[in-house]
Amino acid sequence: MNNSQENRNISRRHFLGLAGGAVGMAAVASMGFPSSWAANNPEIDINNIEQQNNETDVLVIGGGMAGLFAAVKAHDAGSSTMLVSKGRLGSSGQTPFAKGIFAYDENNTTFSIDEFVEAISASALGTNNKAYTRQVAEHSLARVNELKEWGFFNSPLYHNSFNKPIEERNITVKERIVITHLIKEKGRIAGAAGFSLDEEKIHFFSAKSVILCTGAGGFKPNGFPICDLTHDGTVMAYNIGAKVTGKEWNDGHPGQVKNAAACFDGWHGMFEKKPEVTNVGIRHDLGVDLNYQAYVAGSPIKRGKPGEGMGNEIEGGPYVPDEFKHRKPTDTRPDSTDGRPPEGRKPSKEGEAPPGMAGELSGGSSAGMAIHKSEGLVPINDKCESNIPGLYAAGDALGSYMVGAIYTQIGSSLAGSAVQGAIAAEAAAEYCKGIKLQTISNSTINRIQEEILAPLKREAGYSPTWVTQTLQGIMIPNFVLYIKRENMLNAALAYIEELRDHHIPMLRAADMHELRLAHETANMILSAEMKLKASIMRKESRCSHYRLDYPEMDNENWQAWINIYKGENGSMQFEKQKFGSWPA
């Protein structure tokens, strides 16, 4: 061993001692350990970055299920259409990992559509938007039948089946382009902008209408395949004045303790499974019940056979309606006693746990994400339209509250994305008929270029990886994100505001990949601020939002959704929207 190698060897005890103060940190840095702050050494010549301009009637952002139907139906309605995706068509966001798609078929269920809507509302404790609940029931079967025609159910991989209707219609698809900005001119949408991951190129898209199919997002946690989802669409829309909602809710999917970061292992063969159709099966799942149990009694938690409890009963915790307590997961109705599995799904094998929930469980696997369809842009009607003229959203990018703020119907997420993509497309195409394509001003183009490339131009700064890890340490603890109380939320908020004010302006990037990470990190920080402030505002517990200091539902004051928007002075503003109403 040479002297250099010998000097870099350090015991754990010595490291912890050194890391305890500024002198220690300086010593650690001198030994060659990576530092959060460093000089930026770009691997590309910024002066050689090109610009490409694109024009279309309807611009669809996102290549998952919602994006597929948005592009196909906008084209079929007569609009020139372009689809742009950060990933690959059919391999973007959570779509490639969803293996159940709901279809309401009156011939295979005892529920009428009215009964289905009311059963969802009972489980969701009023948090669902009945217009969108009814919508998924009314249109899901038609979307499933189209997917059958395209070969969707023939393979565990979705690219080929998604590409079939796209190629048949000659729809332009641009992949591996990170959209960072939505563009508004004269009070309405005018397009979008971003950069290529594979070329040194900035893209500007002029469009009459934009449909966000960008999915939801999280904090790049271990265990759930959402590390390319960072609430990009929500943040871009918020920055141009769109209202967003649903930030206080949580998705409660657990991961596994063993190899917690191994998504493929943790979902026990689901990635290799062909998709299947599910029928009506109302439930009240994947809130923060397990998080509460871990908070009170410790962890890890071991999942038993289907229908078994989680061990000793724990007093208190999230409210579950009586009709959904101690139910087997094969019940078709809340009051079912015959134990028959829902149509379209096989009964679980003896001793088999639900997908991704076998063995010892670990929380936080989907940290930063809410229940599907319960966060995103606020719709002003049942056409997936936002408060920005010409801007629509579908799927997990739309805060439609389709099935509420708790997991109420298996397979509804994929179905809802298909249904909403089609509805948003038809509305966007109709909107395009009455307007002309706007010209994006040179001043806007220059400003956006500067904002996109800023991390590449910094001489020194913070690594987006380090800032993301810091964010995760602040937000993912069970006692911050899931089991909430005001003092902890405020404490976390102080750290997040520090990242917002001091670290975002100093993010650095050396190449196009790290540039993507820098923009994703900034989006996650803003989403974290929204989550904390909305959680502080909702002083009650309901569905997947639980407050230790307000453990009961407050139906007098909180039969309402929380909307968030950017004030005229740039500050984050909040408002209530009564359940069952449209925004004012």
Can you name each region flagged by the protein language model?
Residues 18-22, 47, 79, 86-201, ...:
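Conserved N-terminal/central alpha/beta ligand/cofactor-binding core
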Residues 54-56, 200-208, 387:
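Core beta-strand elements of the Rossmann-like FAD/NAD(P) dinucleotide-binding domain
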